[in-house]
């Protein structure tokens, strides 16, 4: 029978949960695992995150650091070794006790565990491995676990811990290796990218061993949905690929890819059988696991079944939005990332060498990056389409999809009754669910704008870019400035009416704009 949570553990929890608040982990689990009658807890693929704080962060995971002690001196981190803060460390048993007690009280549905660096990356990962082993095998906790991989730990311990967690993430930290050297001098580019490659290969091998297609496992909960979707968009995917191969688009996308390579040296060959550069312990993970008896039967489990993710800090260094999304795209394409998270920089240390002192964090910029990220993951966009060398920032007043659309009016208007899957997805105001409803419904009847509204299409954005049976909703002119002004007014009328021409580029709407409709 479990004991109640002691006051000492609760005091540690107060300190270490506060220290973990800048780690971003607001996602559903991505892994399905029902209860088996013997263990406690379960994981569900479509959303263990039910509750969010006011700033949008998920609170259904117990999100803590194992310790806030650290041997590194990263300028952006509150736990840097030169900061005078109270230092505390959990034991593996304490983390297990907290997780199980909170789960039984229905406070949480999973665990997000990160850590500062105690002694060395290898020693820290060994402690995290012990914690997860006890949770899974002694306390029989079957819920969702997201673990932070520590750059510099050995492949041995990363392999073993990957069979105990659902998701593992190694933080990229900054969009460029140059930025990393400037603000986190103790962290090495190779020690970040190499474990990412190791985890990627481990996930691929594990899924092949269990007979699962990597794409099907990542994108769809059941096989029927997978094959229905593939049949539906097969021709559309071919047309999208042809569009991406066109000279203008391919040139811009090639520039974005080269920018990502330059930012992090992603073109270099990485050795998955790596030896970490910063480890300084008397024996490795294999000796540690053998000596403690904390070994597991690896083939019985999936390796990191919910995939790996990473995180970039936005606004700590001078990278543009174009550079950030180019690196994110490379992470998805070259490392099979499940998610790339973006965290608006907060200068918690009031470091004069970093921006943001006395200023709010760039939350709007973070939001725009997430919107662009979704366009790349689900809507068929590439980084080189959304931004370019000539236009390296997202618009503050309209979302990235609208920004792309008003800059590519030659692609519009789109006929709702005949356009293919990915063409419809590029229309502002039309999402993935709406596209599926449209394609299904138009087989049986002609669709009207009223029908589209019932299907979830946001007409205040879409009406400028679509026709139904050859007709637009209003007599709208396809003019970039005209449409942009209307989009801004629809989203933020207070801002638009108060804007002056010099500060905001776009003109205030006149009575003639309304008359022309």
Model-derived regions, located:
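Flexible, acidic/Gly-rich N-terminal and inter-domain linker regions that tether
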Residues: 1-69, 458, 466, 474-503, ...
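A glycine-rich phosphate-binding loop feature that marks nucleotide/adenosyl-phosphate handling sites
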Residues: 32-34, 214-221, 345-350, 385-401
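Conserved, mostly hydrophobic/aromatic
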Residues: 61, 74, 113, 170, ...
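Short, charged beta->alpha transition segments
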Residues: 62-64, 93-104, 295-296
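Canonical Radical SAM [4Fe-4S] cluster-binding loop centered on the CxxxCxxC motif
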Residues: 64-93
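Conserved AdoMet/S-adenosylmethionine-binding subsite of the radical SAM
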Residues: 96, 119-380
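Long, highly charged, low-complexity intrinsically disordered interaction regions
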Residues: 353-425, 461-517
């Amino acid at each position: 029978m479990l004991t109640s949570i002691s006051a000492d553990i609760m005091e540690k929890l107060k300190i270490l949960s506060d220290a973990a608040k800048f780690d971003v982990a607001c996602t559903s689990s991505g892994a399905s695992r029902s209860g088996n009658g013997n263990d406690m807890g379960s994981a569900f693929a479509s959303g263990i995150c039910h509750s969010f704080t006011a700033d949008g962060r998920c609170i259904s995971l117990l999100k803590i650091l194992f310790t806030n002690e650290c041997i590194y001196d990263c300028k952006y981190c509150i736990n840097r070794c030169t900061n005078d803060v109270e230092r505390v460390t959990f034991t593996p048993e304490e983390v297990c006790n907290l997780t199980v007690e909170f789960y039984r009280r229905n406070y949480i549905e999973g665990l997000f565990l990160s850590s500062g660096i105690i002694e060395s990356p290898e020693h820290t990962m060994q402690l995290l491995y012990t914690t997860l082993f006890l949770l899974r095998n002694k306390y029989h906790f079957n819920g969702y676990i997201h673990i932070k991989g520590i750059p510099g730990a050995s492949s041995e311990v990363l392999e073993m811990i990957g069979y105990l967690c659902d998701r593992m993430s190694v933080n990229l930290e900054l969009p460029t290796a140059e930025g990393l050297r400037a603000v986190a001098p103790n962290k090495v580019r190779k020690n970040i990218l190499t474990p990412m490659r190791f985890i990627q290969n481990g996930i691929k091998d594990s899924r092949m061993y269990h007979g699962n297609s990597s794409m099907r496992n990542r994108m769809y909960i059941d096989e029927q949905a997978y094959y229905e979707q593939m049949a539906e968009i097969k021709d559309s995917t071919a047309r999208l690929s042809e569009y991406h191969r066109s000279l203008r688009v391919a040139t811009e996308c090639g520039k974005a890819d080269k920018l990502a390579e330059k930012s992090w040296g992603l073109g270099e060959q990485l050795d998955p059988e790596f030896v970490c550069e910063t480890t300084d312990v008397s024996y490795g993970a294999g000796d540690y696991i053998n000596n403690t008896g904390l070994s597991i039967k690896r083939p019985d489990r999936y390796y990191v079944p919910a995939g790996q993710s990473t995180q970039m800090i936005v606004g700590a260094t001078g990278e543009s939005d174009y550079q950030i999304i180019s690196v994110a795209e490379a992470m998805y394409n070259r490392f099979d990332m499940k998610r790339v998270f973006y965290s608006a920089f907060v200068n918690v240390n009031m470091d004069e060498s970093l921006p943001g002192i006395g200023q709010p964090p760039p939350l709007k910029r973070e939001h725009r990056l997430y919107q662009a990220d979704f366009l790349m993951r689900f809507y068929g966009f590439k980084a080189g389409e959304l931004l370019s060398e000539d236009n390296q920032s997202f618009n503050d007043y309209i979302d990235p999809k609208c920004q792309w659309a008003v800059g590519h009016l030659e692609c519009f208007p789109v006929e709702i009754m005949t356009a293919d899957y990915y063409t419809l997805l590029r229309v502002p105001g039309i999402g993935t669910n709406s596209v599926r409803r449209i394609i299904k419904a138009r087989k049986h009847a002609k669709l009207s704008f009223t029908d589209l509204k019932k299907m979830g299409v946001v007409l205040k954005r879409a009406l400028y870019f679509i026709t139904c049976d050859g007709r637009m909703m209003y007599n709208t002119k396809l003019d970039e400035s005209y449409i942009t002004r209307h989009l801004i007014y629809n989203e933020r009328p207070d801002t638009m009416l108060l804007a002056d021409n010099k500060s905001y580029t776009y003109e205030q709407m006149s009575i003639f704009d309304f008359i022309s409709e």
